Amino acid sequence: MGRSLRKGPFVDHSLIKKVRAMNLLEKKAPIKTWSRRSMITPEMIGHTFEVHNGKKFLTVFVSETMVGHKLGEFSPTRMFKSHPVKKG
C-alpha cells in the first residue's frame, strides 16, 4: 500500500534544506545522508548523494528517471555471495 496522495512525498527536512542551499549557491558537492526513506524530487536532479547502506556510504547520482523513487532503492543493503559449488 502506497502513501496517500493527500500527504505528498516524504523528504527529510534537513535533506531538502541542504539541497535548496546547494541550488542557491549552484554547488554540486556530494550530500551525505542516512535518510534512505526520502523520496527523490525534481529539485534533486543533478545532485550527488552519499546514501548509507548500514555499513558504508554509497554514491548515488540523481537523474531524471529516478524521480519518485526513494534514495534507499539505489543503495543496496545486502550482498549475495553465491553458494559453494559442489565438486564431484
UniProtKB/Swiss-Prot annotation:
Protein name per its UniProtKB record: Small ribosomal subunit protein uS19
Cellular component terms per the entry's GO annotation: cytoplasm; small ribosomal subunit
Family: Belongs to the universal ribosomal protein uS19 family.
Pfam families for the chain: Ribosomal_S19 (PF00203)
SUPFAM superfamilies according to UniProt: Ribosomal protein S19
InterPro entries linked to this entry: Ribosomal_uS19, Ribosomal_uS19_bac-type, Ribosomal_uS19_CS, Ribosomal_uS19_SF
GO biological process: ribosomal small subunit assembly; translation
TM regions (residue ranges): none
Record-linked HAMAP family: Ribosomal_uS19 (MF_00531)
Organism from which the protein derives: Chlamydia felis (strain Fe/C-56)
UniProt GO MF annotations: rRNA binding; structural constituent of ribosome
Role, per record: Protein S19 forms a complex with S13 that binds strongly to the 16S ribosomal RNA.
Keyword annotations: Ribonucleoprotein, Ribosomal protein, RNA-binding, rRNA-binding
